[in-house]
Regions:
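Glycine-rich phosphate-binding loops at beta-strand->alpha-helix junctions
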Residues: 271-289
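Short beta-strand-loop/turn "lid" adjacent to the catalytic site in phosphate-handling enzymes
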Residues: 34-79, 97, 105-116
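Adenine-nucleotide phosphate-binding core of ATP-dependent small-molecule kinases
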Residues: 213, 217-268
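Phosphate/pyrophosphate-binding loops at sites that engage ATP/ADP/AMP, CoA/4′-phosphopantetheine
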Residues: 30-44, 142-146, 259-271
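Glycine-rich phosphate-binding loop plus the immediately following alpha-helix
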Residues: 81-89, 100, 107-108, 115-151, ...
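Short beta-strand scaffold segments in enzyme catalytic cores
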Residues: 1, 161-165
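Short glycine-rich, Thr/Ser-proximal phosphate-binding strand/loop in the N-terminal lobe
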Residues: 1-21
Length: 289
């Protein structure tokens, strides 16, 4: 098995005005990695991370023209919308099928988890479904059980942070990790005081697009510290340097609170808590949690 990956910093991406503009940049990066490793574009199948499609159950889906259209014209911006497009182009080069698996919009919420205090607003399921379900299955196999037998709290720690309650193979509750719910993260604002946010929205200082960027893309650690590089921030926090330590510790505090909330969703019956995602490589962050 050959594996490779990379972190695209906020500085690398700042000149792109819309995520769709990153298509060639990300596609060329992947093709360059393969070329440098001497791996020819000759595959039996290509599978990619899913995108922000309509709510759907977990599973594997073939990429088709309607899916590609929906991703190109998605209401919500995220780099995951490009995965299927890149996979489709790669698959066409070698004449093989292309798929996505467990897209971010996997929706298995229990009915009570959908309600909010405003009838016109319903909670929606957007989280790191692919990774969360994959590590859950891997953990289950490691203890000789099936994913569908376990109750798990899975914490994905990346540019966005999702904390989900996995009840016997279904994610019955999880924060919307993209659009302003749950912990704040390297790039997301998370849950914020509603009244103060309403005042900010109608202050006349910001456009709708700017406000949405505060929630997703320019919120969280970037807003406080000017960077989403958690490894660098954690190094400074470990040395006691402010404001890095205070901000990072506060972010991790919001994560821990969300874990506690998911205990309630699972009625206190939890077999394991799983930490995954890039930030899970940080000893400082894992230790704090």
């Amino acid at each position: 098995i050959w594996a490779a990956g990379a972190h695209h910093s906020s500085e690398d991406l700042q000149h792109f005005h819309h995520v769709n503009e990153q298509y060639e940049y990300r596609r060329d990066f992947i093709f360059r990695l393969l070329a440098e490793a001497g791996i020819p574009i000759e595959f039996d199948a290509v599978i990619a991370r899913g995108g922000l499609l309509k709510p759907t159950p977990g599973g594997v889906y073939a990429i088709n023209e309607q899916m590609k259209y929906d991703l190109l014209h998605a209401r919500m911006e995220h780099a995951c919308n490009l995965g299927a497009l890149i996979a489709d182009e790669m698959a066409k080069k070698c004449g093989c099928p292309a798929y996505i698996a467990d897209p971010e919009v996997v929706d298995e919420l229990q009915p009570a988890a959908r309600y909010t205090g405003i009838p016109e607003i319903e909670r929606i399921s957007i989280f790191h479904a692919l990774n969360s379900k994959a590590v859950s299955r891997k953990y289950a196999a490691s203890i000789g059980k099936h994913y569908e037998e376990l109750n798990l709290i899975v914490v994905h720690l990346g540019g966005g942070i999702s904390v989900g309650a996995h009840c016997q193979g279904r994610v019955i509750d999880v924060n919307n990790a993209l659009n302003g719910e749950g912990p704040f993260s390297p790039e997301r604002a998370g849950t914020i005081p509603a009244d103060q946010f309403a005042e900010l929205c109608f202050s006349g200082k910001y456009t709708l697009r700017q406000v949405k960027k505060m929630l997703n893309g320019k919120g969280g650690l970037i807003a406080h510290l000017g960077t989403n590089d958690v490894a660098s921030i954690a190094h400074k926090a470990e040395a006691g340097e402010e404001p890095y330590k205070g901000v990072l510790d506060a972010m991790l505090y919001t994560v821990a609170k969300q874990v506690g909330a998911m205990y309630v969703s699972l009625r206190g019956k939890v077999d394991a808590i799983i930490l995954t995602g890039g930030i899970a490589h940080s000893d400082y962050c894992v230790g704090a949690l």
